């Protein structure tokens, strides 16, 4: 501190050493443990630089301990290779720096002399079995033996195979792929068309036209004319009273003439009905075949043509039904039909009336259903054409007819 006058206080002087004091005898001496003193047998060190803590160790015991440690290390590496057989030898530089005690070997080449992508040279550890080369085909999977206690594949599970990539890499994984089971008839690429709406309409059109053809053929098959038992008439006459023995002489000849005249009245309309139904059946079968072969995909204008034809057919069924029943009603209302009916009723037969029978009515019903089915087919064909044009512009999408 400074006094008010500004004079600095003098610093305290150190205390002077006592000249009569005697120094301590162990002042400059380092204190060593008894075993660290010169001449102590426990002061000896082992070959690895660690001090021995007991006087019973010798170099042979140290060498045996080092050998046990190396064997334990080898067992650990063998366990690692068993867990991961595709893994190569471990590159432990601090472990493989030199040969083990009691072993002789050739040192590895320096890293500078190795190629960049080449395989590593032999090391002191045993190398794992090498994998297949990139140019070699992978080995096929081995079949499982009967006595193998491995996992059994359930019967419903599809057959599978395993594929190993050809390029060996650490941690390589097995790729497992499945083969699909045998597909059904409609699962193939082309037959899938039969499950679409257009194909169902086309097959229904085929069925309806076949039924119309069958109904029309009933009237066409009756060749007409009286047939006695000795002449063995057709099945139609046996069922509807054509084969009988009630007429003889003039009545039999008159019945034969009336049958031929009535048959000639119905023949034109029945023939036209059979021809039209047969032609439509063939046309619908052609459309189904083209759909299975995917012809409309390559030529979309065929879909437009199909749609127009379906609309024309659906519209043509209406006047066809009118003319069909008009001509049939004219034939059933003719004097020939009435005289024929009276002749057969006089002999007790009632199957020759002047009215529409079941085959004529069935043909009309199937034709009416055909109008609806063909109209629906025309709509689906136009929609299919629009979708094909859209897919032609965007081929990434997929559409099945």
Swiss-Prot record:
- Residue ranges annotated as Cytoplasmic topological domain: 1-226, 293-300, 382-401
For bias kind Basic and acidic residues, which ranges apply? 1-119, 145-160
Principal subcellular localization: membrane
Question: Which keywords label this protein?
Answer: Cell junction, Membrane, Tight junction, Transmembrane, Transmembrane helix
Side Extracellular, residues: 248-271, 322-360
Output compositional bias ranges, type Pro residues: 129-143
Annotated Gene Ontology cellular components are: bicellular tight junction; cytoplasmic vesicle; membrane
Region (Disordered) spans which residues?
Answer: 1-173
Q: From the Swiss-Prot or TrEMBL record, what is one GO molecular function term?
A: mitogen-activated protein kinase kinase kinase binding
* Record has Hydrolase as a keyword: no
Cellular compartments annotated: Membrane; Cell junction, Tight junction
Provide the MARVEL domain boundaries: 193-386
Against InterPro entries, the record matches this protein to:
Marvel (IPR008253), MARVEL_domain_protein_3 (IPR053077)
Quote the function comment for this protein. Answer: As a component of tight junctions, plays a role in paracellular ion conductivity.
**Name listed for the protein in its UniProt record:** MARVEL domain-containing protein 3
Species this protein is from: Homo sapiens
């Amino acid at each position: 501190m400074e006094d008010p006058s500004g004079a600095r206080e003098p610093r305290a002087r150190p205390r002077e050493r006592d000249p009569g004091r005697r120094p301590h005898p162990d002042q400059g001496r380092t204190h060593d443990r008894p075993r660290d003193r010169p001449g102590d047998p426990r002061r000896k060190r082992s070959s690895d630089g660690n001090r021995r803590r007991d006087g019973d160790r010798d170099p042979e015991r140290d060498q045996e301990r080092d050998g046990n440690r190396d064997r334990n290390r080898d067992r650990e590496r063998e366990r690692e290779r068993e867990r991961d057989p595709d893994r190569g030898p471990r590159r432990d530089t601090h472990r493989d720096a030199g040969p083990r005690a009691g072993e002789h070997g050739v040192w590895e080449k320096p890293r500078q002399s190795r190629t960049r992508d080449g395989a590593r040279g032999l090391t002191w550890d045993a190398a794992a079995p090498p994998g297949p080369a990139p140019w070699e085909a992978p080995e096929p999977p081995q079949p499982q033996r009967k006595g193998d206690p491995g996992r059994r594949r359930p019967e419903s599970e599809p057959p599978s195979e395993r594929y190993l990539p050809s390029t060996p890499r650490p941690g390589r994984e097995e790729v497992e792929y499945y083969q699909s089971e045998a597909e059904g008839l409609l699962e193939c690429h082309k037959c899938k068309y039969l499950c679409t709406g257009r194909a169902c309409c086309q097959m229904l059109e085929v069925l309806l036209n076949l039924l119309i053809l069958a109904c029309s053929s009933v009237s066409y098959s009756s060749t007409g004319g009286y047939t006695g038992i000795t002449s063995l008439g057709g099945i139609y006459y046996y069922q509807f009273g054509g084969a009988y023995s009630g007429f003889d002489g003039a009545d039999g000849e008159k019945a034969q003439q009336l049958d031929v005249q009535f048959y000639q009245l119905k023949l034109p309309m029945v023939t036209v009905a059979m021809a039209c139904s047969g032609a439509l059946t063939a046309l619908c079968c052609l459309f189904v075949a083209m759909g299975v072969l995917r012809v409309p995909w390559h030529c979309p204008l065929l879909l437009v043509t199909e749609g127009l034809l379906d609309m024309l057919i659906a519209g043509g069924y209406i006047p066809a039904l009118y003319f069909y029943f008009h001509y049939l009603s004219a034939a059933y209302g003719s004097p020939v039909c009435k005289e024929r009916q009276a002749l057969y009723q006089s002999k007790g037969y009632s199957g020759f009336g002047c009215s529409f029978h079941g085959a004529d009515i069935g043909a009309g019903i199937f034709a009416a259903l055909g109008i609806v089915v063909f109209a629906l087919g025309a709509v689906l064909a136009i929609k299919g054409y629009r979708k094909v044009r859209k897919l032609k512009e965007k081929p990434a999408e997929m559409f099945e007819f």
